[in-house]
A protein has these predicted regions:
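Short alpha-helical "recognition helix" segments of helix-turn-helix
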Residues: 31-32
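Helix-turn-helix DNA-binding elements, focusing on the entry/boundary residues of the two helices
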Residues: 28
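N-terminal acidic leader/helix
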Residues: 1-25
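Short acidic, Pro/Gly- and aromatic-enriched capping/linker segments at domain boundaries
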Residues: 37-50
Length: 61
């Protein structure tokens, strides 16, 4: 995968949770770094559709 589906938020959530669940990345910060997306921008995109990264569960809900 060479980019995240930033324009399709439900697909973005699914992709992030897949990458975290399969332990490809340890947390959202690592995903943002790898795909060159600012964490603040990622949080804004997720929040625009009512989603947020939950560190306690290491997933987006």
């Amino acid at each position: 995968m060479d980019h995240l589906p930033l324009s399709d938020i439900p697909m973005l959530v699914s992709t992030i949770n897949f990458l975290l669940r399969d332990e490809i990345f340890d947390n959202l910060d690592q995903i943002c770094y790898c795909f060159n997306v600012e964490r603040e921008e990622m949080d804004r995109l997720l929040a625009s559709q009512g989603y947020a990264y939950q560190e306690k569960f290491n997933s987006v809900k």
